[in-house]
């Protein structure tokens, strides 16, 4: 005979008991370690009482209610941490922020200036600072100056105590590199992608070994529109004139390089050979979508999921067509940002 299914009343009682037991343990630890005082525990408890008293909703729709409860709990712990962060450190000083780097090239000698990119710079700086990163900003650099800035940043002693870093690039670019301020067709001024990865790999930047290294690039990668037109009768597709496929570029040395280049993820604003759009007043579409989805989901989703949500927002082509791509992914674990923790 099959086991009898518990009634809703029994399930509700079980949920309430589990919540109470779980939270009692958390609050005891917070009090014993002087992280939260009695008033702060009481304040959090008032909000969590709502969750316990509505355990029926947990049974009926556990996913939705768990998200609400998690958001309430996270916000209170985040506010408490900001208020008490100076007391948690043993020497009375605030915790050191994790270093992040943002390189923006707006003004060029031969290429057109990237008007509107200041909004991208301010938006990303605000986002990363809210995620706990101390952002170093460098502007209007040649390729050699960008490489020097990267090597100096890789040598920061703060990386020893950090758990990750962000590298954000905003510039013109070619297929596999970021353009410096002196770039033109007759005399390229390019910081190649391989150079960036080489500077921060485990051989040359051991303080970031086994730590996520997130690279975000807002830049065109060619002149193509990145679309094909399909006819409804024959189903044949015709590509734009710049849409030539890249062939023969698959390497077979991944096993050899796996322990050298590890824990990277690069998120680029468009597919190879194609453009990336930027509004002179509102900034780039790619950066604005990153900021939106990070703010919405970084507390609950891992980094790849957030990047995929950004990609999904570009899935249907419209007037301004581009598709961000995740590249050179070598992280072996999911990376959760958990702002406030």
From Swiss-Prot:
This protein's encoding gene: CASP12
Tissue: Widely expressed, with highest levels in lung.
Sequence ranges assigned to domain CARD in this UniProt record: 1-92
Modified residues (Phosphoserine): 85, 90
Identification of the protein by name: Inactive caspase-12
Family as reported in the entry's similarity comment: Belongs to the peptidase C14A family.
Chain segments annotated as transmembrane: none
BP-aspect Gene Ontology terms: positive regulation of inflammatory response; positive regulation of neuron apoptotic process; proteolysis
Active site residues of this protein: 172, 220
Keywords, in A-Z order: Phosphoprotein
GO molecular function: cysteine-type peptidase activity
GO cellular component: cytoplasm; cytosol; endoplasmic reticulum; NLRP1 inflammasome complex
Biological role stated in the UniProt entry: May function as a negative regulator of inflammatory responses and innate immunity. May reduce cytokine release in response to bacterial lipopolysaccharide during infection. Reduces activation of NF-kappa-B in response to TNF. May lack protease activity.
């Amino acid at each position: 005979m099959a086991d009898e299914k518990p009634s809703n009343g029994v399930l509700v009682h079980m949920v309430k008991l589990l919540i109470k037991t779980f939270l009692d343990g958390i609050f005891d630890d917070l009090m014993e370690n002087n992280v939260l005082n009695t008033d702060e525990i009481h304040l959090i408890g008032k909000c969590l009482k709502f969750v316990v008293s509505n355990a029926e909703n947990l049974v009926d729709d556990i996913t939705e209610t768990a998200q609400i409860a998690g958001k309430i709990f996270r916000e209170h712990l985040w506010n408490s941490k900001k208020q008490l962060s100076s007391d948690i450190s043993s020497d009375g000083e605030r915790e050191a922020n994790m270093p992040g780097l943002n390189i923006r090239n707006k003004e060029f000698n031969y290429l057109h200036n990237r008007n509107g990119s200041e909004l991208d710079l301010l938006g990303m700086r605000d986002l990363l600072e809210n995620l706990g990163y101390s952002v170093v900003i460098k502007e209007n650099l040649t390729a050699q100056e960008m490489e020097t800035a990267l090597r100096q940043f890789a040598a920061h002693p703060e990386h020893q105590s950090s758990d990750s870093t962000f590298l954000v690039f905003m510039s013109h670019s070619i297929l596999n590199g970021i353009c410096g301020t002196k770039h033109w067709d007759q005399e390229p001024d390019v910081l190649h992608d391989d150079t960036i990865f080489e500077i921060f790999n485990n051989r040359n930047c051991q303080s970031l070994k086994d730590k996520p290294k997130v690279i975000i690039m807002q830049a065109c990668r060619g002149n193509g529109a990145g679309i094909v037109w399909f006819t409804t009768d024959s189903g044949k597709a015709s590509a734009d004139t710049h849409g030539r496929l890249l062939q023969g570029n698959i390497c077979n040395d991944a096993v050899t390089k796996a322990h050298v280049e590890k824990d990277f993820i690069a998120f680029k604003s468009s597919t190879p050979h194609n453009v990336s759009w930027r509004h002179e007043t509102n900034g780039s579409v790619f950066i604005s979508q990153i900021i939106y989805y990070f703010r919405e989901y970084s507390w609950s989703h891992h980094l790849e999921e957030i990047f995929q949500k950004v990609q999904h927002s570009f899935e249907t082509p419209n007037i301004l067509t581009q598709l961000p791509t995740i590249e050179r992914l070598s992280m072996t674990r999911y990376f959760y940002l958990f702002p406030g923790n």
